[in-house]
Swiss-Prot record:
GO CC annotations on file: extracellular region; host cell membrane; membrane
Name by which UniProt lists this protein: Peptidoglycan amidase Tse1
Record has Secreted as a keyword: yes
Function: Toxin secreted by the H1 type VI (H1-T6SS) secretion system into the periplasm of recipient cells. Degrades peptidoglycan via amidase activity thereby helping itself to compete with other bacteria. To protect itself, the bacterium synthesizes immunity protein Tsi1 that specifically interacts with and inactivates cognate toxin.
GO molecular function terms noted in the UniProt entry: amidase activity
Disulfide bond sites: C7-C148
Listed EC numbers: 3.4.19.11
The organism's taxonomic lineage, starting at the top: Bacteria, Pseudomonadati, Pseudomonadota, Gammaproteobacteria, Pseudomonadales
Reaction(s) catalysed by this chain's protein: Hydrolysis of gamma-D-glutamyl bonds to the L-terminus (position 7) of meso-diaminopimelic acid (meso-A2pm) in 7-(L-Ala-gamma-D-Glu)-meso-A2pm and 7-(L-Ala-gamma-D-Glu)-7-(D-Ala)-meso-A2pm. It is required that the D-terminal amino and carboxy groups of meso-A2pm are unsubstituted
Top-level class of the enzyme under EC nomenclature: hydrolase
Effect annotated for changing C30A: Complete loss of peptidoglycan degradation
Gene: tse1
Length: 154
């Protein structure tokens, strides 16, 4: 049986090669990628660059205590965003279910202006996308309503 977050993974796959901002592929734009995934799922998302998005998530979404809790919520079908503000540009990613890297970092999907080193198509954890200093400062936010659910029996 698929994990309940399969619809989120599918939205990530569908958003990867699209452009949220004209001319900028989502795989090269973390905030555009997250915006596209949220739009596909019908989830309201704060607008702007990653720093602005983290500010908005802090105000309107529920903050989670750990990467393990973030992975658990993702496995339950909730859209979970990992984010960290930066001096100029921060970074945001979509958390998905799966094994925790080093027992605390959840798997993720994210675009990045840094190219392959900062990108993940669900095969890297936030602990591999962010550097060793920043990965322990990440915040995790969950949307209040589940984005995925089990199919109804016919």
């Amino acid at each position: 049986m698929d994990s309940l977050d399969q619809c989120i993974v599918n939205a990530c796959k569908n958003s990867w090669d699209k452009s949220y901002l004209a001319g900028t592929p989502n795989k090269d734009n973390c905030s555009g990628f997250v915006q596209s995934v949220a739009a596909e799922l019908g989830v309201p998302m704060p607008r702007g660059n990653a720093n602005a998005m983290v500010d908005g998530l802090e105000q309107s979404w529920t903050k989670l205590a750990s990467g393990a809790e973030a992975a658990q919520k993702a496995a339950q079908g909730f859209l979970v965003i990992a984010g960290l503000k930066g001096r100029t540009y921060g970074h945001v990613a979509v958390v998905i279910s799966g094994p925790l890297y080093r027992q605390k970092y959840p798997m993720c999907w994210c675009g990045s202006i840094a190219g392959a080193v900062g990108q993940s198509q669900g095969l890297k954890s936030v602990g591999q996308v962010w550097n060793r200093t920043d990965r322990d400062r990440l915040n995790y936010y969950v949307y209040s309503l589940a984005s995925c659910s089990l199919p109804r029996a016919s």
